[in-house]
């Protein structure tokens, strides 16, 4: 079995070897830098100029110092090794709990651990250290339940560390409280001497739990720090816009809140993340219910609570896993006991083969893209961590006021050393600020906001903020100064005039020269087939490069020929009919008033993919032809813009 577990951990290490896309990393590093430079944790809002009066409760300071130190020592590699190390320590404690319940660890434990590694996003986030603390809390409680009188007194030490590493220390207090309720139920159901012994255990647990709550006051914010998780809980249980299925943040959406999409514009899609997250819930839930005799009351109460947390917000999948996988392993192990001897070797071979396959899929860049949308290899994702954009902003000096998307705020503040409009700390600033940023999907709201906040720098993404791009491209007092990897930076003309504006790209020779040439070439390209379903599977993956975003960005900038060139380059080099590129080409023709060519594109698209959404786009595009001053293209076509 040691070979099997070694292969599982090796597969986990291999799956962690992916690009960094975590939007929170910037403000985590920034907070550590602030602490080291000021000698204290931040208290007033340090990173946003929009809500300077807001309080910043930063209970993650110890974890932030560790990730900052790892970054200073080894960059991305150092941070990856640190977080993988945290994950592996938590996994080792999980296996100890599996052994305690099952009398040993076998292939079922290895299978569940490998499945956890497959679902894991391998982000650099404080959840990794919270997994350790949650596992330790549960280990202490379970040993106390089985008669260990000393284990429960380790809880205060665990909680003292947890409260200074992550705001979700509240999960530890919740777990202790729920387990105590369960032990009270067990004590009430006991009889005779067992009843008296059970209540002694309850009193001991209540004492240790009370002490655990008191030591949580030993944090930089005292009582305010203990109360902070209530803000997070209200976000999860309220109608906060962050939970909205359209405008919200993916990790706050309920598990079943989003429909799995298996087809997009005639192409088969494999929503691997959504499938794995649902299978995890089902596999753990069924295993939990299979155990005989039934679980004692503390485990039942804990199971219901963590299942509810997972169903409420998908971000809680990992806590659900670390809490309940040992119980699921116990249930499945009991059910598979009659086949244990016959199935042991085939199961081990299957797990080993799956580990090898996962490493191979990482090697060919499929698994990381299918699960996180990012390539493999330890490097920053350029779309979420643009060094070029940060360097351009730094050149503008200290007078910048940055208007930015929600996901880019943390990195921009860290990389530029400047305050930003908004970042990903949704539980630390008012919901109004996030609603305000969402409302900038309408041009009039965006124009009004940049005047109110006096922004002189705007950072936008080609595939996220098309309305911003199109609005600023038409404003005479703004100029485009940076464009790369899907990120655009605009500056007011009176800011850093030494930074030149970017002009149009020279596309001469990149597109057909006249209508006849266009017509002939379009006929040939339109004959290409749609990608088959197997193109979404390993070794047949269809990976669209940045040309779709580049052509969309040029549309928003009002550069028709440039947009045509980008879209046409993508169409010509691809073996298949890619709808997004044809939509962008049609939009570029609309902009140039080449309506016959635009109609050919729309008709071809709808003939190949009779989709209602595409039909609506075509109708809106044709209706715009007679408008004297149409609204921004992205605003007219779709909230989320072109791809």
PLM feature segments, named:
Residues 208-211, 326, 335-366:
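Signature aromatic-anchored transmembrane alpha helix within multi-pass, membrane-resident enzymes
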Residues 143-160, 200-207, 297-303:
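Short hydrophobic alpha-helices at membrane interfaces in multi-pass membrane enzymes
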Residues 81-101:
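Transmembrane-helix motifs of polytopic, lipid-linked glycan transferases
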Residues 137-152, 183, 284-292:
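Membrane-interface transmembrane helices that cradle and orient dolichyl/undecaprenyl
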């Amino acid at each position: 079995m040691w070979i099997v577990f070694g292969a599982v951990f090796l597969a986990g290490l291999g799956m962690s070897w992916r690009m960094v896309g975590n939007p929170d990393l910037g403000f985590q590093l920034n907070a550590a830098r602030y602490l080291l430079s000021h000698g204290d944790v931040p208290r007033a809002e340090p990173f946003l100029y929009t809500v300077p009066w807001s309080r910043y409760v930063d209970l993650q300071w110890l974890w932030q110092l560790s990730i900052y130190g790892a970054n200073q020592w080894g960059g991305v590699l150092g941070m990856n090794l640190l977080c993988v190390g945290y994950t592996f320590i938590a996994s080792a404690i999980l296996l100890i709990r599996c052994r305690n319940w099952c009398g040993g660890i076998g292939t079922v434990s290895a299978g569940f651990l490998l499945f956890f590694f497959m679902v894991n996003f391998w982000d650099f986030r404080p959840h990794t250290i919270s997994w350790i603390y949650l596992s330790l809390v549960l280990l202490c409680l379970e040993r106390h339940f089985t008669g260990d009188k000393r284990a429960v007194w380790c809880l205060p030490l665990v909680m003292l560390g947890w409260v200074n590493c992550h705001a979700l220390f509240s999960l530890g207090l919740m777990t202790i409280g729920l387990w105590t309720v369960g032990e009270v139920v067990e004590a009430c159901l006991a009889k005779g001497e067992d009843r008296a012994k059970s209540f002694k255990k309850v009193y001991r647990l209540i004492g240790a739990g009370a002490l655990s709550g008191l030591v949580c006051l030993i944090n930089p914010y005292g009582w305010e720090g203990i109360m902070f998780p209530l803000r997070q809980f209200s976000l999860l249980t309220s109608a906060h816009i962050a939970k909205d299925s359209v405008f919200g943040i993916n990790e706050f959406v309920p598990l079943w809140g989003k429909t799995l999409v298996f087809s997009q514009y005639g192409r088969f899609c494999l929503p691997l993340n959504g499938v794995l997250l649902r299978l995890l819930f089902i596999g753990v839930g069924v295993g939990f219910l299979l155990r005989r005799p039934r679980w004692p009351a503390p485990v039942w109460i804990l199971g219901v609570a963590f299942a509810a947390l997972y169903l409420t917000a998908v971000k809680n999948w990992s806590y659900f896993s670390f809490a309940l996988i040992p119980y699921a392993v116990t249930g499945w192990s009991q059910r598979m006991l009659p086949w244990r001897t016959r199935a042991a070797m085939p199961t081990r071979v299957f797990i080993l083969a799956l580990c090898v396959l996962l490493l191979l899929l990482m090697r060919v860049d499929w698994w990381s893209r299918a699960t996180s949308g990012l390539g493999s290899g330890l490097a920053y994702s350029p779309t979420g961590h643009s060094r070029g954009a940060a360097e351009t902003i730094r050149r503008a000096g200290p007078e910048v006021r940055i208007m930015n998307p929600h996901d880019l705020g943390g990195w921009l503040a860290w990389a530029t050393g400047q305050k930003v409009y908004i970042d990903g700390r949704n539980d630390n600033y008012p919901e109004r600020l996030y609603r305000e940023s969402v409302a900038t999907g309408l041009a009039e709201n965006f124009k009004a906001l940049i005047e109110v906040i006096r922004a002189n720098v705007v950072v936008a993404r080609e595939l996220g903020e098309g309305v911003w791009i199109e609005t600023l491209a038409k404003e005479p007092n703004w100029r485009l100064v940076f464009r790369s990897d899907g990120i655009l930076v605009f500056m007011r003309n009176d800011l850093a005039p030494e930074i030149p504006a970017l002009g149009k790209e020279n596309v001469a020779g990149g597109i057909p020269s006249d209508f006849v040439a266009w017509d002939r070439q379009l006929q040939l390209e339109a004959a290409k087939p749609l990608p088959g379903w197997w193109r979404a599977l390993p070794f047949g993956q269809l990976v669209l490069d940045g040309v779709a975003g580049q052509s969309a960005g040029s549309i928003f900038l009002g550069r028709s020929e440039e947009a045509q060139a980008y879209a046409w380059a993508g169409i010509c080099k691809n073996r298949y009919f890619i709808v997004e590129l044809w939509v962008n080409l049609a939009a570029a023709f609309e902009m140039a008033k080449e309506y016959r060519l635009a109609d050919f594109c729309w008709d071809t698209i709808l003939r190949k993919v009779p989709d209602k959404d595409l039909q609506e786009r075509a109708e809106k595009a044709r209706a715009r032809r007679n408008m004297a001053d149409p609204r921004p293209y992205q605003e007219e076509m779709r909230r989320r813009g072109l791809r």
